[in-house]
C-alpha cells in the first residue's frame, strides 16, 4: 500500500537525504507551592534560567554566517528582546513571591495568559506570533527542568546531509540547521507566513510545511 503525505512547499529546491526526526519531549510542568524561606532561591532559579536562555540564543546568533540574508538575525533578536520584556518575566516573579508557586508553574501561567491575548487578535498573522511566546517559554522551561539539549543543538552534532522532520521549528532551530549543513526540512505545522517558511527562504533551504503526520510515518534514517 502506498501512503501519500501532502504539505506546502515554501522554499525552492530538491534535496535527498536521511531523515532525522526531532521528537520534543512533552514537558511535564510540575505545580507545587514553596516555603516562604525558599522564595528568594526560587526567583533566583528563574532569573538564572532566563540568563542561560539569553546565552544560548546569543551563541546561536553567532552561528549566522556574515553573508546570510539580513532577514534572519531579527528573528533571534526578537526572542532575546522577549527575554528582557517585563510582560513575560516580571509576572512569574510576582507569582513566585505572592502565591509561592514554583518557577515552572508561574512561568506557565503567564504563558497561558499571553497566548489568550494573541488568540483574541483579529489579524491572522499576529495570532501566529504566539508561537514566539511558546518558543521562548519552552527554552526557559527546558533549562528549569534540566532537559537534555536536542541533538541539533549539541555542538558536536553530526547531521550534515540530513533532512530534518519536526512538528514545528523555532527560529533558533532553523539557524542551527544551516550551521549543521542540514539539506532540507519538513514540519507538520506552519504556513507560508510562518517563521519557518520565511527563514527557509532566507537561508535558501528546501522546505515543506504543514505536512501532517510526517513524523509518525517516517523513521529515523529513512532515505527521503
Where are the language model's segments positioned?
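Non-catalytic, soluble scaffold/interaction modules
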Residues: 1-224
Amino acid at each position: 500500500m502506498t501512503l501519500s503525505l501532502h504539505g506546502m512547499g515554501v522554499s525552492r529546491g530538491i534535496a535527498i537525504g536521511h531523515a532525522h526526526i526531532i521528537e520534543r519531549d512533552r514537558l511535564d510542568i510540575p505545580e507545587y507551592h514553596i516555603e516562604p524561606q525558599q522564595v528568594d532561591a526560587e526567583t533566583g532559579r528563574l532569573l538564572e534560567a532566563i540568563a542561560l536562555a539569553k546565552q544560548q540564543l546569543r551563541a546561536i546568533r553567532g552561528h549566522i554566517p556574515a553573508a546570510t540574508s539580513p532577514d534572519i538575525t531579527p528573528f533571534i533578536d526578537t526572542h532575546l528582546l522577549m527575554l528582557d520584556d517585563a510582560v513575560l518575566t516580571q509576572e512569574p516573579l510576582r507569582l513566585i513571591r505572592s502565591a509561592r508557586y514554583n518557577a515552572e508553574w508561574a512561568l506557565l501561567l503567564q504563558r497561558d495568559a499571553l497566548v489568550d491575548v494573541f488568540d483574541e487578535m483579529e489579524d491572522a498573522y499576529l495570532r501566529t506570533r504566539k508561537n514566539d511566546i511558546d518558543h521562548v517559554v519552552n527554552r526557559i522551561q527546558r533549562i528549569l527542568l534540566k532537559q537534555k539539549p536536542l541533538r541539533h543543538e549539541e555542538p558536536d552534532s553530526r547531521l550534515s546531509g540530513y533532512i530534518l522532520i519536526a512538528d514545528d521549528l523555532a527560529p533558533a532551530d532553523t539557524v542551527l540547521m544551516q550551521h549543521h549543513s542540514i539539506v532540507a526540512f519538513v514540519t507538520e505545522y506552519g504556513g507560508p507566513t510562518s517563521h519557518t517558511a520565511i527563514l527557509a527562504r532566507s537561508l535558501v533551504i528546501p522546505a515543506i510545511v504543514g505536512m501532517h503526520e510526517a513524523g509518525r510515518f517516517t523513521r529515523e534514517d529513512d532515505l527521503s
